[in-house]
Amino acid sequence: NVEGKIRKKIVNHGYIKGIIGLPPNLFYGTSIPASIIVVDKENAHARRGIFMIDASEGFIKDGNKNRLREQDIRKIVDVFNNQIEIEGYSKMVSLDEIQKNDYNLNLPRYIVKYEEEDNQDIEGHLLGGIPKKDIDKLERYWKVFPTIKNVLFNETTRTGYSELNCQPEQINETILNHEEFASYKEQLYNVFNDWKTRHESLLYNLDHESVPKTVINKMSEGMLEVFDNIPLIDKYDMYQYIMSYWNETMKDDVYMIVENGWKANEELAPENLIIDRYFSKVQEEINQQEANIDQLEQEKTAL
């Protein structure tokens, strides 16, 4: 067909640099998934493949539509610009492979997503015990907390099964009180405090010459940097936290300070925030005294 001939010619000329598959139901008027085709004639003659990204699962529900989050957009940009191959997400597909597929550019032909089936262990249901294969699926956690695994689970006489060393309602407490978890928690605090220390001066020195977009760019880049390669933490989740806070709360404050200065905005901090931070005990005493007054008023009325 004509469409196939056009696609073949464009691919063979090397004009397509990348294809990015987006989630369904993003745009009004259509619920089908959309794709971004990156066309770039620069160095087209030397291009021997097309970089493909399947970002169809990175979104959040927003009413009856789906919406890309800040972290979804940032991950797409980072992966594409750096040509990072991630299993089930991105891949550099050679022209030879595309030719073997008759120039079909549908992403599922090249990027395979493995969805694990919910297999039930019948023996475990009938005879009890926790299948070791289920425990082994949490290997990424056991690498960080190697001895917690032995604290939580105990070998049984049946091969392939373990049992809990504590009551189910004690699992959280057992983990939270373990020294390995405490050490990991401290590591996260140290990483976060490192990020905070790096950027305190950026906020303290806000003035009319500051550029708000530059401020959040530096802070968000720093967040990605410090949480890169931290086990069990997705740096893009952390990026989303700072971007959400910026969009919902912090952005307006920064713009006000840049426009009017600190003095003009000295009432930015809510009164209850100051009380909770510096006078919480005094507030508790006031609340107690007010409760006592109410009680006395009720007794007086009763008399």
Regions found by a protein language model. Name each.
Residues 1-303:
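A conserved structural/catalytic subdomain of Rossmann-like adenosyl-cofactor enzymes
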